[in-house]
Regions:
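A short, basic N-terminal segment
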Residues: 1-47, 196
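Pre-Walker A (pre-P-loop) alpha-helix and adjacent loop at the N terminus of AAA/AAA+ ATPase modules
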Residues: 37-63
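Short glycine-rich substrate-engagement loop in P-loop NTPases that contacts/grips substrate
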Residues: 46-49, 85-122, 139-142
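Walker A/P-loop nucleotide-binding motif
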Residues: 60-78
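Residue-level preference for the first positions of well-ordered beta-strands
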Residues: 60-64, 90-91, 125, 162-164
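P-loop NTPase Walker A phosphate-binding motif
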Residues: 74-89
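Walker B catalytic acidic pair
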Residues: 129-131
Length: 198
């Protein structure tokens, strides 16, 4: 009939998956931190694993896990991000301390600031690791709180965007720092608000 047709081969979805993984920033951790490698020996670890796997089956919502360092928060959140990547979602990985410093440094450069923060505001899935972490356990600055609120509020206003948080602070402490921000996280997380060791 004079027309040419093309059809994707099966390998294209695998290629897209690899590209999404590279773009997410999780490539180095993706192989080590999966559900299959999470050691769930105790009842609380089993509960966390179950909640994380259930979260991946949901179509919307947020996930928050807080608690002491070394408890497996990054592992379980990376496993969630991995699973969502495999489901075809676009994931971005943010190490709070690094990206917050970069964004605050751009605050006086409106154009660059808007371009950079938009990446975090609009990512289909955003994983924020070490949320509001500071040096030596100090309280976050007003600049940190304002930056976090700007990102969270933009994401809160778009139900299609999913957010995964890990941090050493519990949600109750986040609420004390900024009630508007904490209440948005609390509401969007629903049943996926987990804490370790409090």
């Amino acid at each position: 009939d004079g027309y040419e047709y093309t059809m994707e081969c099966e390998c294209m979805e695998k290629r897209r998956g690899k590209w999404r993984l590279q773009k997410s920033g999780l490539q180095d951790m993706a192989e080590r931190y999966r559900f299959e490698t999470y050691e769930a020996k105790t009842s609380w670890q089993k509960s966390i694993l179950t909640a994380a796997e259930c979260f991946c089956e949901e179509r919307e919502g947020w996930f928050y896990i807080g608690g002491q360092a070394g408890a497996g928060k990054t592992h379980i959140c990376t496993a969630i991000a991995n699973r969502l990547l495999l489901q075809g979602k676009g994931v971005r990985y943010m190490i709070w301390t690094e990206e917050a410093t970069k964004l605050k440094a751009l605050k006086t450069d409106d154009e660059n600031y808007a371009r950079e923060i938009d990446k975090w505001k609009t990512a289909e899935v955003l994983y924020i690791d070490d949320f509001l972490k500071t040096r030596n356990g100090a309280l976050p600055t007003d600049g940190d709180i304002n930056l976090a609120f700007e990102i969270i509020n933009a994401r809160y206003n778009n139900r299609a965007l999913r957010t995964i948080f890990s941090g050493e602070r519990g949600l109750n402490e986040i609420m004390e720092l900024d009630e508007a921000m904490g209440s948005r996280i609390y509401q969007r997380c629903g049943k996926y608000k987990l804490k370790i060791g409090w």
